[in-house]
Amino acid sequence: MQLFSIYLFYYLYLKMEKFVVFGRYCEDAIIKREPFREQHLKRLKNLKNSDILVTLGPTKCAKYLFGIFNANDVNELKDLFEEDIYWEKGIWINYDIYPWIQAF
């Protein structure tokens, strides 16, 4: 049974597409995000452990965000992104999602 679960996981994982996300933070995001940061990071850790999140973070200037995700389609990722506390509280103010083909 465990072998089947592992096989199923990798089958579903390989069927998922990769997406890149580019977005923008609100003004003074470093300060405004503080009350929500712990909840946000806990959620990201769960997404990372589930192999949905590959990487996510701000650019050095802290005006933009960049992420790579695994999802079945754009709508699934859009829903997932908008469930984040940073989106709900206006820390992230816009984003674009692009299907991505990992060359190597």
Kindly give the residue locations of the regions a language model identified.
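Conserved, structured core segments of small domains
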Residues: 16-104
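Short, Lys/Arg-enriched N-terminal segments with co-localized hydrophobic residues
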Residues: 2-15
